Amino acid sequence: MDITIGQKATRSITLTADHVKTFAELTGDYNPLHFDKEFTEKTRFKELVVQGGLTSGLLNALVAMDMPGPGTVFMSQNYKYPAPVFIGDTITAEA
């Protein structure tokens, strides 16, 4: 797929407890920050936090399916998570 100047792509998702559970089942990330409300209430987050890998996965989908699209392979990635994502939040990936 050719990319043109000014071309854009976006993907959004509202993250649910089911998404967090499925991601944990696939990866083994059962950190109590994602599942234990009593635990999170004692942290700076105060609410259940979505796994970082789940949020960054939306960017993977955007690149692999939308821009540039099928056949794309990541050779390197770096992520910074400036704020937590909570269950019920809607996130958007843009390229």
Predicted regions and their residues:
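Hot-dog-fold acyl-thioester-processing enzymes
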Residues: 1-73
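Hydrophobic beta-sheet segments that form the core/acyl-binding groove
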Residues: 75-95
